[in-house]
């Protein structure tokens, strides 16, 4: 079941109604499979809905990457999921300590790391070659490129402007830009429109990639810029510098290769690009 398939409209009302429809489907799924444990990950709205349905259907819940900060409404959802979960799988010591401060019994908390990094660290990624991926995106094989991922953030009124600022800063430096359209959150349609309005020369737009091909893109990019959590997690794991714009990932533990800009403008984005490279 994919939440994107059930989206009524990518705005606040449509998104909320879609979550309601999802809630109606989950009890039947749980009744069909009768799991011993419902394993949930992260802070997505659909994960929160699944935790509510599982809790009130009397299923045991384990929560991956519990206790982290997200910097926007998903962070609130993460902590709400934590209150319904029975086992908390924290990715780092900071998250573990936060769970304790939130009142969770320490014997239920396990520091397990971020599982999405395991295949990267262990070298188990099998993807198409970067040249094959570049051809699919119509990128010159010799051209250096920057990966751009911008998701909606309900707490930031100017987030749509980050797209134009990022494009202009990279254009001035002559980088080919690979933009990945945002997830299905409320407000995503506005960001998608801004991305699709960008000039198409020296730029490629993709809906999504397989995880393996996405990791291969990260390994071969010059830089990642935007507000996706992959700039905090996967990018440092492959040695890629990243620039996080706005507050979406504010407060999370970050590697030294992550540059945080809380109030983006053309000048400080350009300065961060220079420092990254």
Residue locations for each model-derived region?
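Short, small-residue-biased leader/transition segments that mark boundaries at the very start
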Residues: 1-3
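Active-site and donor-binding regions of nucleotide-sugar-utilizing enzymes
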Residues: 7-106
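A nucleotide-sugar donor-handling region in carbohydrate enzymes
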Residues: 9-10, 85-159
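Donor-nucleotide binding loops and adjacent catalytic segments primarily
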Residues: 13, 128-220
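A donor-sugar binding/catalytic signature common to diverse glycosyltransferases
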Residues: 39-41, 48, 88, 211-253
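Short acidic active-site motifs
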Residues: 76, 213-214, 268
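Short acidic-hydrophobic, aromatic-tinged amphipathic segments that line or gate anion-handling sites
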Residues: 90, 110-112, 204-208, 259-264
